[in-house]
Amino acid sequence: MVRLFYNPIKYLFYRRSCKKRLRKALKKLNFYHPPKECCQIYRLLENAPGGTYFITENMTNELIMIAKDPVDKKIKSVKLYLTGNYIKINQHYYINIYMYLMRYNQIYKYPLICFSKYSKIL
């Protein structure tokens, strides 16, 4: 087992700097969704709204897309289930996420964020 830090104080400073970098990156988005609310996804995305979104990823091959509607400022979400080489979104199968985004092209794309790793930091 490799230890990155021998000094626990250096490790604490390292975690704080990671936390600050992540918060800055998330605040550059048009909205900031706190980690407590991210765990409680309360609505499925019926039609992809315009505005911004980011995709979170966990260990169960399940992606969650969170979007903010620019008009009414409501946050909506959809779960994307990975089944083999296909993604199942609201009972429809897509070869990859880009096929879905091509169908709903009014969404502004952001890079994939691995949320399960960052939720422990925040």
Curated annotation (Swiss-Prot):
It comes from the Viruses. Belongs to the asfivirus MGF 100 family. Plays a role in virus cell tropism, and may be required for efficient virus replication in macrophages. This is Protein MGF 100-1R. It comes from African swine fever virus (isolate Pig/Kenya/KEN-50/1950). The lineage of its organism: Viruses, Varidnaviria, Bamfordvirae, Nucleocytoviricota, Pokkesviricetes.
